[in-house]
Structures are given as C-alpha cells and as structure tokens.
Amino acid sequence: MKLSVLAQSTAADGVPAAQTLRDTVELAVFAEELGYHRFWVSEHHNHPAINGTAPEILMAAISQRTSRIRLGSAGVMLPHYAPLKVAEQFRVLESLAPGRIDLGLGRAPGGDGLTSMALNPNAHEDANNFPSNVRDLMAWVSGDPLPSSHPFKSIVAHPETNTAPEIWMLGTSDYGASVAAHFGIPYCFAHFITDGQGVKQALTLYRDNYQPSERFPK
C-alpha cells in the first residue's frame, strides 16, 4: 500500500499565516523522508481556517526542497481559470520536478458563491463547460494537438517538457466519476468531505464506465 498526504495549510491560533505555509513545505520534506508516495495541497478561497489558496505556487516551493515524492494539487478548481493558463503553470512545474507532478482537477468552487464570482464572473458558465475545458487542458498538458476544427488549434502550451503531469479528477459525486471515466484518467473521491457517503456508488460508476486511455489503459 502506498500512503500519501493531503495538506490544507490550516490556520492555527497565534501562528502567522505565512508560517503555516512554511510548515506545509517542511511537512512535505518530512513526508518524503518517511517514504510517503504523494503530497497534495489544496485550493480554498475566502476561508478563515485555510491558508492554502494557490496550490501551484506551494508546489513550486516544495519541488525545490524534495527530490522523490510526487507533488499535486487537490485540486485546481478549473471553472475559475482558463485551461491554457493552468496547462502552462503545470508544464512549468513539470520542468522543475520532472515525473513528479500531479494535476488534480475539481469542479467545485472551493469557496462561497460571491468569492467564485470575484475569481471568475463567468464561473457558473465555465462549470457547465467543464468537460470541454478538461479536454482542452488535457491536450495542452500532454502536448497532443487539439481537433482541427478547434478555434485554438494553433496554440501550444509552453514550456516544452519531456514528461507530462499526471491528471487526476477529484470529486464527491457521480459527476466527477463519470467525467474521469470518460477521459480515462484517475479519480479521487474526497471521502473526508462526505464521510464516505456516495463513495461506493461513484467508484462503481467509474469502474463500470472507464474508457481506457493511452496513459492509463486500465
């Protein structure tokens, strides 16, 4: 069994916010020393108890203090962002830590409705376009071409890398499981959010509908 860590950089009484982020970096270093397989950091917004708002930046810091453990986002809330920008960020991370980067994606807002609007006024529309945005992101992350009819087919995400981040779908419902199954990517159920409710149904749906992909044939 491979054990991994999810860190949220939670706030603590009397501890400066900046220190909680530095503590997260040190926790990742310690986790690697103990032999843990993955270290993922979360994305939450406008939450007084959580200082982990920018996983890609925290991952970059951790990448320079570690050498083996896989580093990931848990996750990037895609409706807030342009898929191309996310792809570029994670290709930079892949350049810094080749073969160690996991791009965990989520559809949830990671905060309240007003905060979602502040991050992206079109977040609701982008949430409805989630599958197509995942498709575009996967192409840009992997370096595969977009369909010939795509308006952005000439755009390439940089920097060039010899390896690509591993894309994961995160979720707490059947929806995320179905999207992950459709695209043939790993799925991670947020058991700690739901107390396990819905996990068996989501995982069964995922396994029964999984479409093998080149990177994950089974």
Predicted segments with their positions:
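Acidic (Asp/Glu)-rich catalytic clusters
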Residues: 32-33, 59-68, 94-101, 179-182, ...
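A conserved active-site cap/scaffold subdomain adjacent to cofactor or substrate pockets
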Residues: 175-196, 202
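Hydrophobic faces of well-ordered beta-strands that scaffold small-molecule active sites
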Residues: 3-7, 39-41, 71-74, 101-105, ...
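Flexible, glycine-rich active-site loops centered on histidine and acidic residues
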Residues: 2-17, 79-145, 187, 195
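Acidic-and-aromatic substrate-binding clefts and catalytic sites of carbohydrate-active enzymes
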Residues: 45-53, 79-84, 194-199
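Generic structural signal for well-ordered alpha-helices
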Residues: 24-29, 56-60, 87-91, 131-138, ...
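An alpha-helical appendage that flanks or caps ligand/catalytic pockets
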Residues: 123-156, 197-218
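N-terminal beta1-alpha1-beta2 module of alpha/beta enzyme domains
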Residues: 1-69
